[in-house]
Amino acid sequence: MTDQKLAKAKVIFVLGGPGSGKGTQCEKLVQKFHFNHLSSGDLLRAEVQSGSPKGKELKAMMERGELVPLEVVLALLKEAMINWLTKIVISLSIRYPRELDQGIKFEKEVCPCLCVINFDVSEEVMRKRLLKRAETSNRVDDNEETIVKRFRTFNELTKPVIEHYKQQNKVITIDASGTVDAIFDKVNHELQKFGVK
């Protein structure tokens, strides 16, 4: 059963392979539509930074390129959403779910999603972007070995999520190989079809 505190939330799932530009485009969604942006990855990294026992366990999993258990991610997302709703927030952009069970459970226990934005770009482009980002980021998962694992995880687990939501006519697939602004123009145009203005 969905959480009544979140019944009016407008949630957009944002998907795409590692390095597809999800974070950059979510920043633009925040600026244009005044969405709040929740990234399961950012929430997990914040937990790691806290130095808590759970954070240390999560750090080891992330360094190995493993997926964090669904219950942990869902609890972090739900807590963050409820905290933001106290600030009268009704729109969220979430870089989630990575696998089908996560999406189904999120919609059952938290709230339904309005639509899913899927950023589509070749692995070669994503790899180049990630290695470039690694030059300045402190992310433990921006290295060649982990990048390969992340691509495999995306292909095996996240693509079925996209297919599931396509059957519900909720997927917006965006070619994410262009410039940041050109990509966002496409996002903006497609979101209007779902009433986001």
UniProtKB/Swiss-Prot annotation:
A GO term from the CC aspect: cytoplasm
Domain of life: Eukaryota
Positions of region (NMP): 39-68
UniProt keyword terms in alphabetical order: ATP-binding, Cytoplasm, Kinase, Nucleotide-binding, Transferase
InterPro entries noted in UniProt: Adenylat/UMP-CMP_kin, P-loop_NTPase
Keyword Cytoplasm: yes
Assembly and oligomerization: Monomer.
Full protein name: Adenylate kinase
Species in which this protein is naturally found: Schistosoma mansoni
